[in-house]
Regions:
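Cytosolic catalytic domains that perform sulfur/thiol-centered chemistry
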Residues: 1-186
Length: 186
């Protein structure tokens, strides 16, 4: 079981500083689902050389990071996050990209777990390094060239899951107004 929480703190409307990233580790250590560990998307599972936040690292590096966290072929992994499932969903996709399918997302996440008064603990649990069978799926994430092709392909749909004000170009939160042409907002 892994807590995957990351917090984005929006400080102002300056598009050059859209948000500050904070690891959820401190809240995890204060109170977590019993027997869970923590996966830090920003510090441990992103490409540190990229100028962009949360960039997917090379798949070999990502697989090695998961292996070091104790994720391996002998286990089923349950992911959860606080205040929504976006962070656990992101890591679920990352696991699939390196060929790991034995993962689920906790319905309702940590917030629902607490509301149900289910067991929680304090502290930081770590798991031993595990055997991880690396089987990359290069088609799970696409690059800008694939997106350009999809924009001109009537059989492809590009979905944007950001808020409608960002999608419609009314909120400069990410520094550049607008959306990918032909994308639909959900």
């Amino acid at each position: 079981i892994f807590d995957c929480t990351t917090y984005l703190h929006y400080k102002d409307n300056d598009p050059t500083l859209p948000y500050i990233v904070e690891s959820g580790r401190e809240n995890y250590e204060f109170c977590n689902i019993t027997s869970s560990s923590f996966l830090d998307l920003h510090l441990d599972l992103s490409d540190k050389a990229s100028p962009f936040r949360f960039t997917l690292p090379k798949l070999e590096i990502l697989a090695d990071s998961f292996k070091k966290q104790g994720i391996g072929s002998d286990y089923h992994v349950i992911l959860y996050s606080r205040n929504g499932a976006q962070w656990s969903a992101r890591i679920w996709w990352m696991l699939r990209a390196v060929g790991f399918d034995q993962a689920s997302i906790l319905d309702g996440g940590f917030n629902q777990w607490q509301k149900m008064n289910l067991p929680t603990s304090k502290g930081n649990l770590t798991f031993s390094k595990s055997d991880f069978i690396f089987s990359p799926r290069d088609n799970i994430f696409v690059d800008k060239d694939a997106v350009h092709e999809a924009m001109n392909n009537p059989k492809c749909i590009i979905l944007n899951s950001l808020t409608s004000d960002i999608h419609n170009g009314k909120n400069p939160r990410y520094g550049r107004l607008g959306r990918i042409p032909t994308s639909l907002n959900i």
